Structure formats: C-alpha cells, structure tokens
C-alpha cells in the first residue's frame, strides 16, 4: 500500500478540500483536522499541517499538491521512527515492542553492522549486535511480561489492541526524548482503520502522522533496528523466565511448546504457566488435556 506524507500550504489544503468535499468523513483522531475517503485512497490532514495519503491511488491525489512519483523521498533518506514487535506468535515469553529513531547519516554504520529484519538473522547475530544498537541508536523499548499480558487480555485489550497500545506508547515516549522524525512507520500488524479504532482508547497521543506498511523491516533501517532490539529483548526475557522455572522455554507455539507447557503445568500448576506463557493460546488447553 502506497503511503505519502506531504506538507503543503494551507491554500493548497483548502483547495483540495473544496475539490473533494463530498469525500469528507468523520475521524476519531483528535489530531486529524479533516479525513477523506476517496476511491483507492484515504487522506488524513493533521493539525500539524502534514497530510498522509494512503492506498493504491495515493500518488494520483498527491499530484494535486505538485507531487511526482519520481521525486518521492524514500524513508531511508529521512529522519525516521520505525517500530516493530516480537513475541506475538510465541506461547512462551512476553511481548516486546521497540521504536527506534534513525537518521540518514547512520545508514552506513547500520549496514556495516549487518542490520536487517530480525527474522533473517540468527539469534547469535542478534545478541551480538543488539547491545551496540542500544548504545548508538535512540530508541524506546517496552516489554509486556506474560503475567501482565494475561492480566490485560480479555479485560481491556485483545491481541491486536494491546499491540496498538504498546506501539503508540513506544513512539510517544521516544518523541518525548526530543527526536524530530519526518516520518513514522509501523510494521503493519493490522489495518489502518483498526489501528485508529483502538488508538482512540489510548491516553498518550501525538500529532505526528503514522504510516502502517507491510514488510517495513525490509524497507526502513529504523524498523529493522527496532526488529533486532525487540528480538533481543524477547530472547532475554525467554531465558530469564525459563531460568526461574528450571526449564528451557522454546520460541513459537508448536509441539515443542506443547510439551514444555504440559511439564510446567504438572510442576507448578496454572500459576506457573501464567508466569511464563500467554494463556489464551491453544497450547494451554493442549497442556491441560495432555
């Protein structure tokens, strides 16, 4: 899905609104002045003056403001915040979310370090480069422990809305540190409509427009950095939880997790699983019936 961020003049904004006034739609985001649902695109006009165009027809509508596709500035050439999460698909371990701020002058350093999507790197490589990234790159890391995850899921949050809350909070806290991104990219885990719906429940908000992009870790180094740091945080948490229980906790939610879950249930009961696992996964019922 194409995503374009522009900062046109107020005169151009008003001309755009007049031209497409029949496409105006309501928005629950207090930082969006105007929201338009157009054929093959949505347009969010923020109080900050920025405009976010998303969808297959984004370039067409951006041309109204003089935008040309050949002039599109890649996210790699902008000061950028990127976010990613790790642990969502694993029965054991917490949920780690990281927002990282990367500037173009850091790109060579990151490439030489071998930064890429954590899914393409070995755990050994991640544990090796993550401490360097934590020291050199401004970031905000959040970890929701399994016990806290189990406490909030089904009460205030579901598996998607809890990620919205964590991504939003990580970005908010990083912005509070004074970074000034020209773009904010989230590795898409839900639709923009769903994200905005759940975001309305959150207290800490910011006016910067965000872009949800699929496979963003392969497009933006800031997202790749977040992916690596989040993976390292998740692995560290997995090790620490296992050490306290005396078990080696596997990542993922396959048969290996079923086996260990059954053993922990026999040794510690549900209290043990609540300490180290996400209970709403099917692995819990499998462990009970083993």
Swiss-Prot record:
Q: Which residues form the RNase H type-2 domain?
A: 78-290
Q: Indicate the principal place this protein occupies in or around the cell.
A: cytoplasm
One GO molecular function term of this record is: RNA-DNA hybrid ribonuclease activity
A GO BP entry:
mismatch repair
Cofactor(s) essential for the protein: Mn(2+); Mg(2+)
The places in or outside the cell where this protein is found are:
Cytoplasm
Catalyses: Endonucleolytic cleavage to 5'-phosphomonoester
Question: Which purpose does this protein serve, as stated in its record?
Answer: Endonuclease that specifically degrades the RNA of RNA-DNA hybrids.
* Similarity annotation: Belongs to the RNase HII family. RnhC subfamily.
Please report the name of this protein according to its UniProt entry: Ribonuclease HIII
This protein's species is Streptococcus pneumoniae (strain ATCC BAA-255 / R6)
Gene encoding the protein? rnhC
